[in-house]
Amino acid sequence: MTFRVATNDDIPGLNGLVNSAYRGEGSKQGWTTEADLLDGIRTSEDSLREMIERLDAVIVLAEQDNEMKGCVYLEKQADALYLGMLTVRPNLQGKGLGTQLLHAAEERAKEIGCQKIRMTVITVREELIAYYKRKGYKDTGERKPFPNDPKFGIPKRELEFLVMEKEIR
């Protein structure tokens, strides 16, 4: 597995990868699907382009045999590195790639001088929260509303985020 920073040339493949892992029937092959919580798409080519072109952010791609297997969005914020859109192909979930992507995020945090990583997780995703806790992330107690914007998906029920953090040494 190799890791690199995504470019605009990767946008079509990234769009397919992320949406297949989070939404729709294909996402149900993995354990991280949001298909029962949200309709619509997880991201779009325009959103990915905005992420890639930000000066304070990167999308790290995991590839094997020239095929995208996973990715993670990392954005430097005032006091932390924000981690989002952690994605692993549904048929590869549970095989350690998510852990490798988290490790890549921690290395990036160290490189740019961030002492913690912050993320948001939908509160009803108990299995995902438990996964992140096993990886050293803690519930900060902070909650945020789920955005009322179809570009993030259309909630099938009331949703909110919890904020999790991990200290990086």
Predicted regions and their residues:
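Conserved GNAT-fold acetyl-CoA-binding loop/helix
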Residues: 19-48
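C-terminal "cap" of GNAT-fold acetyltransferases
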Residues: 49, 115-118, 122-129, 135-169
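Conserved acetyl-CoA-binding loop-helix of GNAT-fold acetyltransferases
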Residues: 88, 94-107, 134
